[in-house]
């Protein structure tokens, strides 16, 4: 006897069940009371609110922006960056600060480690004159200052460097050998409960830099853990694990690191994606190197042997020469970057950017030609004017 299989019902095709009129009236009354008490938009049907794209701050690495799935770090959310010592945690955070400032945003830096180097920050593009910096005495003071700045509603990004340095006041005032179990974890839990809503309302991105510790007595699984308890793991919308994987050398001299960032947690897009990019000493993240890697990956830039080509034109021989060429030609870099973003569906189509790029190039050529014509006309007019003045002088004499 053959079994009959019924076709699966499509939930989208089924009619929506109408709510009972009495229950609907009661719900509408409740929503009206909530709106009256707490303001418009405090509670609403999700369908009543138009879908909005998440605002982001670029990280400085195109590869990492693509791995995050939305083009950067989300605004109004908590982000945790953790990894071993000298892996590039602070450098990545400073690049985010610099990108926020370039868009006209305001940034703050809570330097709990008292180790911020203004000269290095300037090299990464940070406007140190407008950067708000605080070097607090203890953890409570650091988080209270951060909360007050967030609630001002004027910040775009705030960096707390680092969670491990947020020492509770009781621990500072106590003796060196005293035991203070769970003090920092409770402090973080309380602070994050207060901050989360304020961050969303103000549209401020909070970046917590964290350090790694090892659990004692772990024989199976990963013994590494982060400081500050578990609260940050729950409240963070994005968690980034950053590691050095290779030393970049120019001959025998080390010039930087090849860095891998794994998106361990992501509430905005699928997690567990990885990104690799160059981090150069004194320069930070190599934007051009990341653009080359991603453009090659999606086929916007092609490589044949050691030569790199873009739309049939040779960019150069060898990755380092191409990187320098793109650094000297930011317009081409931006054009390639936009095409890569279009391939990932983050902005308009690649064809549109190609047309825009060609139009911009044509406009640039036209402007240059017009400038040359004007220059030639001016040069030709000068001798004529000189001759006229000479004739006038002779006639006068």
From Swiss-Prot:
Transmembrane segments: none annotated. GO terms for cellular component: cytosol. GO terms for molecular function: ATP binding; ATP hydrolysis activity; ATP-dependent DNA damage sensor activity; damaged DNA binding; single-stranded DNA binding. ATP binds at residues 83-90. GO terms for biological process: DNA recombination; DNA repair; SOS response. It is found in: Cytoplasm. SMART domains: AAA. InterPro entries: AAA+_ATPase (IPR003593), DNA_recomb/repair_RecA (IPR013765), DNA_recomb/repair_RecA_CS (IPR020584), P-loop_NTPase (IPR027417), RecA-like_C (IPR049261), RecA-like_N (IPR049428), RecA_ATP-bd (IPR020588), RecA_C_sf (IPR023400). Keywords: ATP-binding, Cytoplasm, DNA damage, DNA recombination, DNA repair, DNA-binding, Nucleotide-binding, SOS response. Residues 1-23 are annotated as: Disordered. Its main location: cytoplasm. PANTHER family: MITOCHONDRIAL DNA REPAIR PROTEIN RECA HOMOLOG-RELATED, RECA. Can catalyze the hydrolysis of ATP in the presence of single-stranded DNA, the ATP-dependent uptake of single-stranded DNA by duplex DNA, and the ATP-dependent hybridization of homologous single-stranded DNAs. It interacts with LexA causing its activation and leading to its autocatalytic cleavage. Belongs to the RecA family. This is Protein RecA. The gene is recA.
């Amino acid at each position: 006897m053959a079994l009959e299989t019924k076709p699966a019902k499509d939930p989208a095709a089924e009619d929506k069940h109408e709510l009972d009129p009495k229950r609907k009236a009661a719900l509408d009354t409740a929503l009206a009371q909530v709106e009256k008490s707490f303001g418009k938009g405090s509670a609403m049907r999700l369908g009543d609110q138009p879908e909005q794209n998440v605002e982001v701050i670029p990280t400085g690495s195109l590869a990492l922006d693509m791995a995050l799935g939305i083009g950067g770090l989300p605004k109004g959310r908590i982000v945790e960056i953790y990894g071993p010592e000298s892996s590039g945690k602070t450098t990545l955070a400073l690049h985010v600060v610099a990108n926020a400032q370039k868009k006209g945003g305001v940034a703050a830096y809570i330097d709990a480690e008292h180790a911020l180097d203004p000269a290095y920050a300037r090299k990464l593009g940070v406007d140190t004159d407008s950067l708000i910096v605080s070097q607090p005495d203890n953890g409570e003071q650091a988080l209270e200052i951060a909360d007050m700045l967030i609630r001002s509603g004027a910040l775009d990004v705030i960096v707390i460097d680092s969670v491990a340095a947020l020492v509770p006041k009781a621990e500072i005032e106590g003796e060196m050998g005293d035991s203070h179990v769970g003090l920092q974890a409770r402090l973080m839990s309380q602070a994050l409960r207060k901050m989360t809503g304020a961050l969303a309302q103000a549209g401020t991105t909070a970046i917590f830099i964290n350090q790694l510790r090892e659990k004692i007595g772990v024989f199976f699984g990963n013994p590494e853990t982060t400081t500050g308890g578990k609260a940050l793991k729950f409240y963070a919308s994005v968690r980034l694990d950053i590691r050095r994987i290779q030393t970049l050398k120019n001959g025998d001299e080390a010039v930087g690191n090849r860095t891998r960032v794994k998106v361990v947690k992501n509430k905005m897009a699928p997690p567990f994606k990885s990104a690799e990019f160059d981090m150069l000493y004194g320069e930070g993240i190599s934007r051009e190197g990341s653009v080359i890697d991603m453009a090659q990956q999606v086929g916007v830039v092609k490589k044949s042997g050691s030569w790199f080509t873009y739309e049939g034109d040779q960019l150069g021989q060898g990755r380092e020469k191409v990187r320098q060429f793109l650094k000297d030609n930011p317009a081409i870099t931006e054009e390639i970057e936009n095409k890569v973003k279009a391939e990932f569906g983050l902005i308009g189509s690649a064809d549109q950017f190609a047309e825009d790029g060609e139009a911009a190039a044509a406009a640039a050529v036209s402007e240059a030609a017009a400038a040359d014509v004007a220059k030639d006309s001016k040069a030709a007019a000068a001798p004529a004017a000189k001759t006229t003045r000479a004739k006038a002088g002779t006639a006068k004499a």
